[in-house]
Amino acid sequence: MSQFADFYQLIAKSPLSHWLNTLPAQLSEWEQTSQHCKFSQWFNAVERLPMLTPARLDLLHGVEADCDPPLSAGQQAGIESLLRQLMPWRKGPFSLYGVSIDTEWRSDWKWERVLPHIAPLAGRLILDVGCGSGYHLWRMVGAGAQLAVGIDPMQLFYCQFAAVRKLLGGDQRAHLLPLGIEQLPALAAFDTVFSMGVLYHRRSPLDHLLQLKNQLVSGGELVLETLVIEGDSQQVLVPGERYAQMRNVYFIPSATALVSWLEKCGFVNVRHVDMSVTSTDEQRRTAWMTSESLADFLHSDDPRLTVEGHPAPLRAVIVAEKH
């Protein structure tokens, strides 16, 4: 049986039911095609994790689960060992039965910046594009979402999400599908669509904005979080081969240019609601992500610049609505 069978059953009587015309074939192909060379190792680690039902689950203030009585030190060590097989952990943090996953990013800080500015998520059907490990999916559930669906083609992120969900008792309020946005039909079914940390990786940013729009119901809300630069509506940075050591960065607009792009794509009530400089406290090397991080990507003599001489990472949150 497909590992996505529960999701198919869940959406069969929802506004997403028409997705069943294409989705099962896509995911069946994914299950049958050659996977990343480490996928079987990652998936085996997930399979070996216990299915635990938390006695205490806090998704409102973080992603934290505990049981009563607490797990023994040996049980905790066994879970931690399996979770470490899924390194690097980039988006979090998680606190699961005494095991603290200190991820590269303090994704909870981003959530705290975003949440005050968006429509309440209670009862909403939500799509999170490029969701990574799924950390924000759980925070969306904690904020009252009816269903939070994440898409991300990275197989490690799929396994990380599956591991966390297994430790949360197989919670069906959040699902991650190993797909890219370009594989989705125009569903026009989600009340809120998030795209956080994705736009600058797209060769055609306006096409990405239109793809996001196509997933929203009329009156639905887009929450866009992305790199920006200082400047007026005409300012867009097109980095050379790399930006902060990343190869796949194509366009970094000013916040005002980004607002113009959204309006050009037909969004209404476009608001620039937050701007923050990424600090080395928010993105850093940890015991769960041991390779280079932001401190290694900034200019040694001037942290206002990347190693390539571009402006250092500055992130904006833009909120808009589909007419």
UniProtKB/Swiss-Prot annotation:
Bilayer-spanning residue ranges: none
Catalytic activity: carboxy-S-adenosyl-L-methionine + 5-hydroxyuridine(34) in tRNA = 5-carboxymethoxyuridine(34) in tRNA + S-adenosyl-L-homocysteine + H(+)
Annotated Pfam families: Methyltransf_9
Domain of life: Bacteria
Positions bound to carboxy-S-adenosyl-L-methionine: 91, 105, 110, 130, 181-182, 196, 200, 315
GO molecular function terms listed in the Swiss-Prot or TrEMBL record: methyltransferase activity; transferase activity, transferring alkyl or aryl (other than methyl) groups
EC top class, as a word: transferase
EC numbers: 2.5.1.-
GO term, biological process aspect, one: tRNA wobble uridine modification
This protein's UniProt keywords: Transferase, tRNA processing
The family this protein is said to belong to: Belongs to the class I-like SAM-binding methyltransferase superfamily. CmoB family.
Subunit note: Homotetramer.
Function field: Catalyzes carboxymethyl transfer from carboxy-S-adenosyl-L-methionine (Cx-SAM) to 5-hydroxyuridine (ho5U) to form 5-carboxymethoxyuridine (cmo5U) at position 34 in tRNAs.
Stored PANTHER family: METHYLTRANSFERASE, TRNA U34 CARBOXYMETHYLTRANSFERASE
Name of the protein: tRNA U34 carboxymethyltransferase
Organism encoding this protein: Sodalis glossinidius (strain morsitans)
Lineage, opening ranks: Bacteria, Pseudomonadati, Pseudomonadota, Gammaproteobacteria, Enterobacterales
